[in-house]
């Protein structure tokens, strides 16, 4: 994504961003390249890379990244759960995955289900529903199927 595209995106009334890092773009697709966002979801290594902070508490990393940039942020942390930040308030919810088979796409599932809710939902709701979507996704090998609304609702009711 180019700098011009990011600038145009940042003019949108509500911007949700999932700036992923992988082996082909490490260091070149950082969340810090976005001047602003309303909602960010990144994983713990992506947060630390963007903040250039390997050692401090994840809350300090999130505070540093959100400063004047984003009011709502989630940092996913695999089997450790997810951390949420909303205007100075931090929250952590544990992971709820029972039998992980393949972690590919768990963050995508988290972001896809929570981005439409981020404008009006609470950080607790975002973490709860996002963790549930991620937990369901890690039970699916590869991209054989998507997380369905029915499966998500059933999972949340059961937990």
Predicted features and spans:
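Ribokinase/PfkB-type carbohydrate-kinase core domain
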Residues: 1-103, 118-123, 127-132, 139-159
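Short basic (Lys/Arg) and small-residue
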Residues: 107
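Flexible, glycine-rich loop/tail regions that form catalytic "lids" or insertion modules at the edges
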Residues: 113-114
């Amino acid at each position: 994504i180019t700098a011009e595209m990011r600038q145009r995106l940042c003019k949108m009334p509500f911007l949700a961003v999932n700036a992923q890092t992988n082996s082909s773009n490490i260091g070149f697709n950082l969340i810090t390249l976005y001047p602003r966002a309303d909602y960010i979801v990144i994983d713990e290594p992506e947060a630390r890379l963007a903040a250039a902070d390997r050692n401090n508490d994840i809350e300090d990393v999130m505070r540093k990244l959100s400063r004047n940039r984003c009011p709502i942020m989630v940092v996913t942390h695999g089997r450790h759960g997810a951390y949420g930040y909303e205007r100075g308030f931090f929250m952590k919810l544990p992971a709820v995955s029972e039998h992980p088979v393949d972690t590919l796409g768990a963050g995508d599932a988290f972001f896809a289900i929570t981005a439409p809710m981020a404008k009006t939902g609470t950080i607790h709701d975002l973490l709860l529903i996002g963790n549930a979507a991620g937990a369901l996704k890690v039970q699916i090998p590869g991209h054989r199927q998507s997380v369905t609304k029915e499966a998500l609702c059933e999972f949340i009711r059961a937990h």
